[in-house]
Amino acid sequence: MKKLVNLVSGGADSATVLAIAQKMGYEIYAMSFNYGQRNNAELRKVRELVKEYNVKQHKIVNIDLRAFSGSALTDNNISVPHYHDVNELPDDVPVTYVPARNTIFLSYALGFAEVIGAKDIFIGVHTSDSANYPDCRPEYIKSFEEMANLATNMGVQGKKITIHTPLIDMTKEQIIRTGLELGVDYKNTISCYEPTEDDLSCGTCLACMIRLDAFKKNDIQDPIKYV
């Protein structure tokens, strides 16, 4: 059975990617990060989420991206923006962008992949995020894959490493629809940037607004609880 490293955050996108990877028949090695994020709820959710899939091993890596701050997700001095309507959402890079986060996460995944002999890495970046987050763009993923094959022993031996982005051409609406078709139970996910201590989602941050809109367009109620 082919092995893969699957980056898993505990959000709806991650759950969908896990379901896709399982359907494709991979032996899944999941990797998550405790990086000093404001949303600790995602780590609690991800532990439950991976139990629903045939995950061979789940690693939670501790790193502290608060060391250089620069994001509302890692710096409590920067407020998370809240909105009243999905049409208010920004078109540019928001303060919730964590500098170089996907590069850091993919680098860890790459190292893990080499150790276990996996030539495939899955990450849940997609079209809906590409305008707001530069490290979610297809050209970024392509460049990282090229670097991965130049910078690793596997790559120079001709064992090509592939960064898979199964959601890349999907909107959030399509991602939720795909997950529902694959039987994903989204109640064990959380997308909120600023949930309460008892894991209630705020419903008004960028991530919540996009998620709620996607469920609405699929004519189904989001199963998680909101404030």
Curated annotation (Swiss-Prot):
<protein>
    <recommendedName>
        <fullName>7-cyano-7-deazaguanine synthase</fullName>
        <ecNumber>6.3.4.20</ecNumber>
    </recommendedName>
</protein>
<feature type="binding site">
    <location>
        <position position="208"/>
    </location>
    <ligand>
        <name>Zn(2+)</name>
    </ligand>
</feature>
<keyword id="KW-0479">Metal-binding</keyword>
<dbReference type="InterPro" id="IPR014729">
    <property type="entry name" value="Rossmann-like_a/b/a_fold"/>
</dbReference>
<dbReference type="GO" id="GO:0005524">
    <property type="term" value="F:ATP binding"/>
</dbReference>
<keyword id="KW-0862">Zinc</keyword>
<comment type="similarity">
    <text>Belongs to the QueC family.</text>
</comment>
<feature type="binding site">
    <location>
        <position position="205"/>
    </location>
    <ligand>
        <name>Zn(2+)</name>
    </ligand>
</feature>
<keyword id="KW-0547">Nucleotide-binding</keyword>
<dbReference type="GO" id="GO:0016879">
    <property type="term" value="F:ligase activity, forming carbon-nitrogen bonds"/>
</dbReference>
<comment type="function">
    <text>Catalyzes the ATP-dependent conversion of 7-carboxy-7-deazaguanine (CDG) to 7-cyano-7-deazaguanine (preQ(0)).</text>
</comment>
<keyword id="KW-0067">ATP-binding</keyword>
<keyword id="KW-0671">Queuosine biosynthesis</keyword>
<dbReference type="GO" id="GO:0008616">
    <property type="term" value="P:queuosine biosynthetic process"/>
</dbReference>
<keyword id="KW-0436">Ligase</keyword>
<dbReference type="Pfam" id="PF06508">
    <property type="entry name" value="QueC"/>
</dbReference>
<dbReference type="InterPro" id="IPR018317">
    <property type="entry name" value="QueC"/>
</dbReference>
<feature type="binding site">
    <location>
        <position position="202"/>
    </location>
    <ligand>
        <name>Zn(2+)</name>
    </ligand>
</feature>
<dbReference type="GO" id="GO:0008270">
    <property type="term" value="F:zinc ion binding"/>
</dbReference>
<comment type="pathway">
    <text>Purine metabolism; 7-cyano-7-deazaguanine biosynthesis.</text>
</comment>
<feature type="binding site">
    <location>
        <begin position="8"/>
        <end position="18"/>
    </location>
    <ligand>
        <name>ATP</name>
    </ligand>
</feature>
<feature type="binding site">
    <location>
        <position position="192"/>
    </location>
    <ligand>
        <name>Zn(2+)</name>
    </ligand>
</feature>
